[in-house]
Amino acid sequence: MGQTAICSDDGRLSIWYERPAPHLSRYISAYDSYRSDLPSGEVGHDVLPPAWASIRFMLGDGYWGAKLGRRNYDPGPRDALFGPSSHAGFSRYGSMRVVCAGLTPLGWARFVAQDASLHADRIVDAGAVWPGHAAALRAAVEKADDPAAAFDAYFTDLLDRTEPEEPEIARLLELLLDPAMIAITEMAERMDMNPRTLGRLSARHFGFTPKLLLRRARFMRAMIQILRTDRGGWGALVHEAGYHDQSHFVRDCQLFLDMPMSAFVQRPKPMFEASLRLRAAVLGTPAQALHPAPQGLTISG
């Protein structure tokens, strides 16, 4: 039934995480839920980190909205499909319960099967992008005592009715998450394709260029380490994450957060900070953007 964490001293904010069934783990990163019980008129604020795609349903009455880059969603869709993101989003909510299924790039290719770059840094009505499936999956989740069981059943059935994804997607995912990988030319060589073909593959299935995704992974590693410490002096943590120049980290803070790290640390983000801990406990990694590639891959080079 997963694990739950309380995110506020008064117990009004909570999150839940569960693993998908093993045969779905290459496609689904996690199942999670966010609940807030706030007095009428009170609005909470939080952070949506840069991530892969996800499908999110608001159950019952409630309110949530978000700002993602220059786009403002107020209110957000009740049945929402979040495309892969390169910007942190800043959410607001009243009382609500949202349940989610995170999609890896392989899951996007297998189940959604659309050009991810067209949905990058966007939140859309899931029914418009995933017609038929969004409504059916919502109905299954609403009826279930255990959302994870409903998600597992639906995606297992969908797995039997969809074509296998290209093997190159898993190979690229592994390279994008390798902290030692810094050169696109080396990545292209190990993928046995030219850089232009690599760029097209990355945009279609991951939403962005390989260069941006390598920067996103490096930045997420640094940001998570900073949020885990109560002290200043972040230079060593930034270096450990792969930055060799502090100015590059400062630049990436503006790119991925639209603000300095010091300002981001001070923002209210109770659910996000709790999710870093709970996700690591349940799944082994604190953020979806760093969710590991399927095991057993072989990459030449």
Positions of predicted regions on the chain:
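Residue-level "edge-of-site" marker
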Residues: 201, 216, 251, 267
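HTH DNA-binding helix-turn interface
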Residues: 201-210, 253-261
